[in-house]
Amino acid sequence: MSSFDIFSPTTSVSGKFFLEASAGTGKTFTIEQVILRSLLEGNVEQTKNILVVTFTNAATNELKLRIQESLKQALTLFSQALSHPETPLPPYVSSQETKVKQLYXKXRNSLATLDEMNIFTIHGLCRFTLEQHFPWVQPIHPSSMFSEPQTIQQYILDYLRQNSWENVLSPKQYAFLSYHHRATTQQTRHLADRLLQDYASTPNLALPPLSITLQKVKNWSSQYKHLSPLSLEELQDFSLRFKQSDLPIDRELPDFVKQFETDPNSLDILFFPGMVQKFQEENRNKKKLGPPFSPLDPFLKDWLLIAQPFCQKEPIFHTLLKSVQQHLKTYCAQSYSHDESIATLESLLAQNDHVVSQLRKQFQLVLIDEFQDTDKRQWKIFSKLFASPDYSGSLFLIGDPKQSIYEWRNADLPTYLQAKNSFPKESQLILDTNYRSTPQLMQALNHLFSLPSPFLETPQTILYHPLQSKGSASTSYSEFRPIHFFTTQDSQEEALWISKTASYLRSTFAIPFGNMAVLVQDYPQALKLITHSTIPMAYCKEKRIFDRTESPYLLILLLEALLYPENQQKIQAILLSRFFHLSATDIHQHLKIFSSLFFMLNTYLHQYSLLATFYKLMGETVFSQTIGETLLQTPLGDIIFQELEELCLYLDKTTENPHHKLFHLINILDTGKYDEELSFSSQSNDDNVLKITTVHSSKGLEYDVVFCSSLNKVKEKSPSVHMREMYVACTRAKKFLFIPFSSIEKRLQSNKKVSALANYANITQHDNIPHLVETLTASHPEFFSSGTQPPESNISIFSEPLPEQEFFSLPILSSQPIYSFSSTTESQYFTEPFQEISSSSLFPGGSLTGTLIHKLLESLSGNFNASLEEITHKAQTLLKNTILEGFESIISEKIYTAFSTKLPFVSGSFALKDVHPYNIRVEETFLLQENGELWQGIVDLFFEHNNRFFIIDWKTSFLGDEPSLYSPDKLLLYIQRQGLDKQGVLYKRAAKKFLHQFNSSLQIEMAFVFIRGIDDKGNGFLQPSP
C-alpha cells in the first residue's frame, strides 16, 4: 500500500480512499488535516457538507474540539502570513497574497460555522437520517423540554389513552392488568411506569393475536356443544375433586355456565382466573377421585389449554408490551434500540433512492473512523450511500485491523477486508510513520510483529507493515533494551518487580509514576498486583457508575426521601442505608426529627440544585458526626461519595425538575441506556501514582513505560484475538516495554487455554516462552533484553501525606412549619367550628370510621365498576375485627351507590364506574406553598374523564340519617364552617401546578362526596364555586 502524507502537495484529498492507520501514526491528526485541506482547497463548500462518523460520543466531542483548534491555528497562521509574507505555510498552500486572503476568509467562515459540521456515532447518524428524511417514522420531533424517557412516556400514555390496546387484549384482560398495576400500594406500580421500564425488553411471553385465540375458542365450543346445557351442580361437584385454591370460584362457576349457554364463542369464556388456578392437574385431590370418568375432564382440560395463558398477568403484559413497542417504532424514532435504528435505516434506504441521492448531495466529504469496528449492516449503509460510483464526493475509511479488539461490539474483520478489497490498489493507503515511540522501540516492535507471517488469518491474510519512527521521545537504553522480558513466578513477585523497576526508572530517567502503566486482562489481576505493590497504584479502567457500587440505588432512595418527605417508609429506607447507618431503634425514636430534616431538604432541593442538596445533607450532624463522615467510614465510601457527586451533577445538567431527575435515573437503571458522561473513571492525574488499566481501556492512550502483565495471563481466546490484544498492549509504550513470563519451561499445547505471549510463541514456531525470549535476545540484543532481578533504585520508596480535604458551606435555610387540615386546630383557623352529630342508626361515626372507610375506598380504586357482591367481599375482609364489623352490608351499599350514581359536575354528569381504570390515581400527596405557608395534603381521588380532570374528596361526616340533611345548601354551610372551602381551593391549585408542566390550559373540577348521603336526587354531592 502507498504511503499517505497529508502535507504533500501531490497528495489528493479528493476521491475515495481506504486508509490504514497503525497505532501511533497520528490518525486523529490526519482526520483534522483532511477536513482542513478539503475546506481550504474548495472540495467542500461549507462545514455542514462534512460528515464524520466516530465510535463513541466522547470521541465526537474530542474530535470537534481538535478540529476547532486546527482551524484556529490555520486562521492565526494565515493572519501572520498577511502581515509577514515570509511566514512559512504548509507545502500544499500557495504563498500568493491573494490566495492567502481567500484561505483566511475560508478558515474564518469554517470556524464560525463549525457547529454545523455533522459528527456522529453510527447510531447518531441513523437517528439523524430517520428524523430528517423519514418523517413518518417520527412525525413529531422530540421537545427540547423533555428528555428521551419523558418523550417515550408521553407516547406510551397516548397509546393507553387512545385505547390502542383493544387491538391485542380483551377488555377483561386489560382491566385485569390495570387493576394489578394500580399506583395505590407499595406492592404495585402504575402500568405506564412498568411499560416505560420494560419498553426495550423482549416480550417473549406475548400471546398470539386475538383472532387466533378466538378461532381456538370456536373450535373448542363446537367440539363440546353436546354438553349444553351445562349443569352448575355437576360443575360444582366436579370442583370438589380439586384442592382449595387461593382465588375463590364460587362466583365464577355460575358466570361460566351462563357464558357457555349464552355466548360460548366469545373471548369472555376464557377469563375466569379462579377456575384456571383451581383446575390445574397438580391441584387434583387424589382422596376425592369421584367417578372414574367425567365428561367435564376433557372439556375443562381443553379449555385450560386456551384459558391458562389468556388469564396470566405476565403473558398479558408481554402482549401489551409488544404492541406498545410497535406503536413506539411507528410514532417515536427515539424508542429504537441502537441495532434497530441501524436495521431500520438499512431497510428504508434500500427502498428510497431519492433519499440516498439527497444524502449524497448533502455530504461532500465523509470520513468513517475506527472502521475496523464496523459490522456488515453498518457497511451496507455506508457502501450504498458513499462507496457507490454514483457518489461524487470524497470518502475516507480509516481503521486498523490489528486493533480490532471489540468483537463483542459486532466488530467484523471479514467486513473490513471486504470493504478494503472493493477499493482499487492505488486507493488503498497507509500511514507508515509512528510519532509515539522512540526509534529504537519502534524498530523492536517492527521486528516483534514481523515474525508472525502472516500477522493475522481471518481467513484472509493480514500483513504487518513496518513503520518508521519520528517520535519525539528519546531515552538511554543502558540498563534495559526497548523491550525487556522479566521472569516471575506469581503475582506477588511480579508486583514487587514492577514496583522496584518503576522506582528505578523514576529516579534514573525522571519518568513520573503517572507516565507509567500496567496493562492487565481484568480487574482481579489488577487487584492482585495492587495488593502486593510497594508503590502507589490506581486502577483506571473506564467503568459505568452503575457497575461498581450501589451509588445509583442510594441516590434513588435519597431522591424519593427528598421528594416525598411525608412518606415515612421512604424516610426509613434512606435512614437504614449506609448514608445514616442507623438502627431500627434509633429511627423509631427520632423519626420526627429526621422527617423535619427531609422537609427542610425538600425546600432546599427546589431552591438549589441536587448537588448542593447532597452537600447540604453530607454536612448535617447526626449523633456526634456528620452524615458525610458516616458515609466515608463505610467500605468503598470514598468511591460512593465521588460517584454520587458525578450523578448529582449529571442529573442537574439533564433537567431542572427534581421529579424528572428521579425519573431519569430510574430509566437509566431500567433500560441500561446512559450517556458517555456517566462512564466514570477512578483514574488519578497524580504523577505520583502508577496506573493500572485493562488492554481494552488503554486503546488510544500512550505511556512512557508499559508493563504488559496482560500478556502473561492465561485466557481462553482465539489466536487472532490474542495477537490483536498483544499488538494493542505493546504499542501503548513510548520508551520502555516490559513483558513478564514464567521461567518454567512447558511445551505449548495449542488446544488448551494459553496466554497471549504463549500464543505468540506458538505462532512463531517456538517450543515455549523461555525459548522465544532466548531467541529474541540472542538474535537482536539491541532490541530485546531479559533478566530475573529488578534494578535497585537510589532513593527510598516515595511517600507523601495526603492533602487536607477542603470544604465549603452553603447558606443554611431555616425550617418552616408545614400545615395540613388534619393537624391544624379549629380554633386557630376557624371561628365557628361545626359540631358533628355523633349518633347514627346506620353505622358508627368518628375519625376511626372515616379512616377505615377511606382504606376501603382506596382498596377499590380502579375498580369502580365492581359489583355490590365484590364490594361486600372486600369490606368483610378489611373491616373484620374493627368497630365496623357487622356494618359491612350497609357500608358496601353506600359505596356502591357512590360509584354508580351520576355525579352532577358543572361540565356534565357521569358515574365513577364510567371512568377508565387507567385514568385514576388515589391518595396523591402534595406540598404547596400558599401565601408564604407550606401546606401538605392528600388528594383522595384524582382522575381524568372526557379530557377533563377531576378531584373528589371523600367525606364520611355524619350530619344525620335523613337524606335532606345532605342537600347542597346544607353541605355548603358545613364546609364553610369547617373551612373545607379553603381545602378545595388548595387541592385545585396543587393539581393545576402539577398539570401545568404538561399543558397550562387543562381544567380541573373539584367536589366533595359524602358517603352517608349520596343519592340520585343530588344529595351528598357538592361542587364548590370556582
From Swiss-Prot:
Cofactor requirements of the protein: Mg(2+)
Cofactor stoichiometry and binding remark: Binds 1 Mg(2+) ion per subunit.
Residues noted as binding Mg(2+) in the record, renumbered to the chain: H854, D940, D953
Gene Ontology biological-process entries: double-strand break repair via homologous recombination
Residues that hold ATP according to the record: A21, S22, A23, G24, T25, G26, K27, T28
Catalytic function, reaction form: Exonucleolytic cleavage (in the presence of ATP) in either 5'- to 3'- or 3'- to 5'-direction to yield 5'-phosphooligonucleotides; Couples ATP hydrolysis with the unwinding of duplex DNA by translocating in the 3'-5' direction; ATP + H2O = ADP + phosphate + H(+)
Gene Ontology CC, one term: exodeoxyribonuclease V complex
Active site per the UniProt annotation: D953 (for nuclease activity)
UvrD-like helicase C-terminal domain segment(s): 452-700
Pfam families attached to this UniProt entry: UvrD-helicase (PF00580), UvrD_C (PF13361)
Domain named UvrD-like helicase ATP-binding: residues: 1-438
Annotated spans, Nuclease activity, interacts with RecD and RecA: 815-1026
Record EC number: 3.1.11.5, 5.6.2.4
Keywords linked to the UniProt accession: ATP-binding, DNA damage, DNA repair, DNA-binding, Exonuclease, Helicase, Hydrolase, Isomerase, Magnesium, Metal-binding, Nuclease, Nucleotide-binding
GO molecular function: 3'-5' DNA helicase activity; ATP binding; ATP hydrolysis activity; DNA binding; exodeoxyribonuclease V activity; magnesium ion binding
Keyword check for Ribonucleoprotein: no
Annotated region (DNA-binding and helicase activity, interacts with RecC), positions in chain: 1-766
Function summary: A helicase/nuclease that prepares dsDNA breaks (DSB) for recombinational DNA repair. Binds to DSBs and unwinds DNA via a highly rapid and processive ATP-dependent bidirectional helicase activity. Unwinds dsDNA until it encounters a Chi (crossover hotspot instigator) sequence from the 3' direction. Cuts ssDNA a few nucleotides 3' to the Chi site. The properties and activities of the enzyme are changed at Chi. The Chi-altered holoenzyme produces a long 3'-ssDNA overhang and facilitates RecA-binding to the ssDNA for homologous DNA recombination and repair.
Assembly with partners or alone: Heterotrimer of RecB, RecC and RecD. All subunits contribute to DNA-binding. Interacts with RecA.
Domain comment, as recorded: The N-terminal DNA-binding domain is a ssDNA-dependent ATPase and has ATP-dependent 3'-5' helicase function. This domain interacts with RecC. The C-terminal domain has nuclease activity and interacts with RecD. It interacts with RecA, facilitating its loading onto ssDNA.
Misc note: In the RecBCD complex, RecB has a slow 3'-5' helicase, an exonuclease activity and loads RecA onto ssDNA, RecD has a fast 5'-3' helicase activity, while RecC stimulates the ATPase and processivity of the RecB helicase and contributes to recognition of the Chi site.
Similarity remark: Belongs to the helicase family. UvrD subfamily.
Protein name: RecBCD enzyme subunit RecB
Organism: Chlamydia muridarum (strain MoPn / Nigg)
Encoding gene, per UniProt annotation: recB
